[in-house]
Design a protein with these regions (language model features):
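Hydrophobic alpha-helical connector segments
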Residues: 56, 70-100
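A general structural signal for well-ordered alpha-helical segments in protein cores
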Residues: 29, 50, 54, 83, ...
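Alpha-helical DNA-contacting segments of helix-turn-helix folds
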Residues: 54-61
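Residue-level detection of the helix-turn-helix DNA-binding "recognition helix"
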Residues: 34, 48-49, 59
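Short hydrophobic/aromatic patch on the recognition helix
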Residues: 37-47
Length: 105
């Protein structure tokens, strides 16, 4: 992974953490820049707008949800075992979000 992509990934990770605390609507280039100890223009250069930053955060949130909840459940046999795994994974994720915050609340 190139340095620019590593930086962008780190920004998205920090922005996701921030968004779980303040909500996606409160997420701004300035707030993320402060957390990352970067200039606003440095963060802006990776996304081009506040909206693109927010979209990247939502995509990352959904990607992590799929990795932690959906894909592991799909390894289970069809039917009730898969449904039980999906529910168990979802509840595990939800209880972790109680401590860290949920992106949408």
């Amino acid at each position: 992974m190139q340095k620019g992509q590593q930086t962008k990934s780190a920004i998205v990770d920090a922005a996701l953490g921030l968004a779980t605390q303040i909500g996606i609507e409160g997420l701004s280039i300035g707030a993320v820049a402060e957390v990352m100890q970067m200039s606003k223009s440095g963060v802006f250069a990776h996304f081009g707008s506040r909206e693109e930053l927010q979209i990247s955060v939502v995509r990352e949130y959904h990607h992590r949800f799929e990795l932690e909840v959906f894909y592991p459940a799909m390894q289970e046999p069809r039917g009730l075992p898969r449904l039980q795994a999906l529910f168990a994974n979802w509840m595990k994720r939800t209880s972790a979000e109680i401590d860290s915050g949920c992106l949408y609340i």
